[in-house]
Amino acid sequence: MFEIKLNDRITEFLRKFKNSAKSNEGIDEDIDLFLKRHAIPMQSLLFYVKEYRKDSDLQCSIKELLKPLEFEFKPKAVRGLHYSEDFKKKLEFLKYQEQELEYQSMVKRSKSVFSLQEDDELTPSQINKQIKEQVTTVFNVLVSVISVVVAIWYWTGSSTNFPVHVRLLLCLFFGILVLVADVVVYNSYLKKLEEAKVKEKTKVEKKKVLSKITL
């Protein structure tokens, strides 16, 4: 935003305006502020000119007052510039207090997750189930790798004229590729499963009694 910079004519007009019969305490304070800042908003200047044209002693036009015309750009307001020292100290205290609460909340969440992981004790049936799942996974991975290796070996032998060492390298490459892909997918599955278990255990069950029936 910008304001009109006071020139000699505007300054003289404001002083006459202040000493006129139309002035009051509030207007005097505003004019003193404008004179001190050496600038005035355009809206205020138009208001003064409109009001005081009714007085024959203060005949003037806005065109005459704005010669020469210069603008005064208002400085950008800085947050907290006019805060008192006590208020600034209170804000700093509230800021540190909020940071402390966030830190304590984060520590509590971390402790709850670690306690859940440490307190997990597997039963024999759960151990057997995990062993079966791991054996099944290893078997499925081996089947996938062997199937791909056999398919590559058969394709390079029947459809192409690759030498034996090239066929072996292709089989080895695709076998390792399938093995790595299966391991990555399985690890991702285990990670998501563990996250789901932790999230489920950290949930707080809320019960609400809707009504009570007495027989």
Swiss-Prot record:
Signal peptide: none annotated. It holds the Pfam family Vma12. It is found in: Endoplasmic reticulum membrane. Disulfide bonds: none annotated. GO terms for cellular component: endomembrane system; endoplasmic reticulum; endoplasmic reticulum membrane; Vma12-Vma22 assembly complex. InterPro entries: ATPase_Vma12. It comes from the Eukaryota. Keywords: Endoplasmic reticulum, Membrane, Transmembrane, Transmembrane helix. Residues 1-134, 187-215 are cytoplasmic. It is a multi-pass membrane protein. GO terms for biological process: vacuolar acidification; vacuolar proton-transporting V-type ATPase complex assembly. The chain crosses the membrane at residues 135-155, 168-186. Residues 156-167 are lumenal. The keyword Thylakoid does not apply. Present with 2030 molecules/cell in log phase SD medium. Required for vacuolar ATPase assembly. This is Vacuolar ATPase assembly integral membrane protein VPH2. The gene is VPH2.
